[in-house]
Every structure is written in C-alpha cells, then in structure tokens.
C-alpha cells in the first residue's frame, strides 16, 4: 500500500526492493517464509498503535531497523536489544550550520567549528547520521531532543555512548565504515557495554 503512494517508478522500485530484502532477511532468522511475517507498530512516545517503529508481531526477541539512502538500503538486526541504523549519501548537499541549529549539542557544534572550513559540512553530516541512528534505536524519532546530548567515546569499546534523559541506560552508536558511498551508523540500546557488529553485506546499486 505504501509503495503505491510513491509516484516515481524508480523510487517505487527501490522501496519495494528494500522491503523485500528486509522480509527475506528477517524470515531467514526465523526460518519461515517471508510472506508469513506480520508487523506491528506502537509509538514509543505516545503509545499510539497507528504509527511508530515497526516490529515483528511474533519476534522471538528479534529487533530490526531499515534505512534507505538513494539506491542504498541497510538492514540492522539484533536479538533482545533495540537497534537503529541510518545512512546519508555523501553526494547530498549538507549545510553544517543548519544541522547545528537542528541537532548538535554545544560540544558537537564546537567540534565542527574547530574543524577546517572545508571539512565542516562532512563532519556535521556524520554527526547527524549518528544522531538519526540513536533516535531510531530509541523508537522516539523526532520526539527525541537531539541537541541535549553528545555521543562520546566509551573507554571500554570502539562505540560512542550517549546518555539521554529519555532513556534509563546509555545508547551506543558506531559508524559503519564498510559503507563507502554514504555516512552510515548503527545504534543499540539494552545490549551491554560492548556490542558486536557483523556486517554481512553492504551493496549499493
């Protein structure tokens, strides 16, 4: 139904392909046909079942998140931990000042301003991608205030840790450097202090 609302054929095809891949991946974890998967939504902010982060109806602890950026689609899957993933194409125009106004903490803005002028847009784009991944992991999305927290290096791992007023425990976020034509990041909460990420495939085209 959602695909039918997309007017451009190329964009509609990308949407359909990404969601077909999502179904195939999730079905492989549960050893069932993709068409038998049932999804549900509940908003983490207001509890409304008409919108919110998608979940499997019979998940067995499986959690997932999908992001699309142009022809690139990324799927993140975890067990018994919330997950969010985001990607932003490298060729997308970025204005670091606009990102700073919308999403960066004072520490992050200072970090961007201290960078070489030619690197500021790129750095802000990467910080934005991390923020989006965290927002998706929490399930709060745009209801999460992105400017009140900073993802900082965690001494025990390669992850960055973000302490949010809205969450009882830190959210961990890491860049996905294997994705070469986009900024990409994955975030998890409820997975302990040093989650392991295995990248099985990252294909654009």
Where are these regions (language model features)?
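Core catalytic alpha/beta fold that binds nucleotide/phospho-ligands
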Residues: 1-205
């Amino acid at each position: 139904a959602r695909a039918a609302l997309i007017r451009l054929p190329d964009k509609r095809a990308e949407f359909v392909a990404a969601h077909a891949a999502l179904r195939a991946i999730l079905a492989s974890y549960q050893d069932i046909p993709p068409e038998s998967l049932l999804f549900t939504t509940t908003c983490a902010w207001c509890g409304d079942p008409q919108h919110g982060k998608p979940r499997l109806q019979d998940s067995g602890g499986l959690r997932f998140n999908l992001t699309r950026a142009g022809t690139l689609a990324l799927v993140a899957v975890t067990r018994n931990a919330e997950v969010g993933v985001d990607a932003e194409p490298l060729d997308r125009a970025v204005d670091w000042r606009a990102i700073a106004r919308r999403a960066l903490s004072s520490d992050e803005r200072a970090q961007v301003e201290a960078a070489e002028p030619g690197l500021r847009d790129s750095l802000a784009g990467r910080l934005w991608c991390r923020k989006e991944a965290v927002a998706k992991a929490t399930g709060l999305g745009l209801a999460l205030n992105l400017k009140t927290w900073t993802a900082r290096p965690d001494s025990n791992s390669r992850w960055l840790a973000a302490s949010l007023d809205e969450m009882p425990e830190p959210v961990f976020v890491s860049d996905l450097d294997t994705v070469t034509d986009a900024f990409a990041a994955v975030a998890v909460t409820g997975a302990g202090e040093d989650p392991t990420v295995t990248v099985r495939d990252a294909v654009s085209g």
